[in-house]
Amino acid sequence: MREILGNKKGIRDSVLNELIALYDVQVPLGQLISAELALKLADITEFINREISLYISRSGQITNIVIGGNDSVELPAVEGRRGIGRLSGIRCVHTHPNGNPVLSGVDFSALKNNKFDAMVTIGVTAPDYTQSIISFGMIVGLDKEEQFICDESVSYTHLRA
């Protein structure tokens, strides 16, 4: 079902319709997120001053869109069954309206608990969104206690459509 979850209070219908239209966007294989989609998310994030989260499947299909507050977003549970050491097949892409691209402790917890393929943040820098910085974390293995080990990478590449 194509719906927007989360904190929709005070959000214009035109903005909600822009977000619903994102369900039609296909992220190319081999990309965490396309530059065009990242720029669109940055634009909407700046306009509403709230975090936005997308779930994207391995095939590039957007499966969930959630609006949060200005410093957090509630993430829905990832559907499907998987083994104890298997990832979900979903990457979570979300925005930080304050421009900080660094993954928070909450982001790393969500990465581990939901077994995301990746947790991606876009530190939105306005008014020139091409200056926004993207970082991402991934589960890179298991430790001796079979707990997930995460690693973060920050991309200083500027967004260009």
Task: Label the model's feature ranges.
Residues 97, 122-129:
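Short beta-alpha junction loops
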Residues 38-42:
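Short, basic/aromatic recognition patches
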Residues 65-114:
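Short HxH-centered metal-ligating active-site micro-motif
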Residues 141-153:
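Acidic, Ser/Thr-rich peripheral helices and adjacent loops at domain boundaries
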Residues 157-161:
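Conserved small/polar residues in nucleotide/adenosyl-binding loops
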Residues 1-30:
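Short, compositionally biased leader-like segments
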Residues 45-49:
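A short catalytic or substrate-binding loop motif that flags glycine-/basic-rich loops and adjacent residues
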Residues 51-57, 120-121:
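Short beta-strand scaffold segments in enzyme catalytic cores
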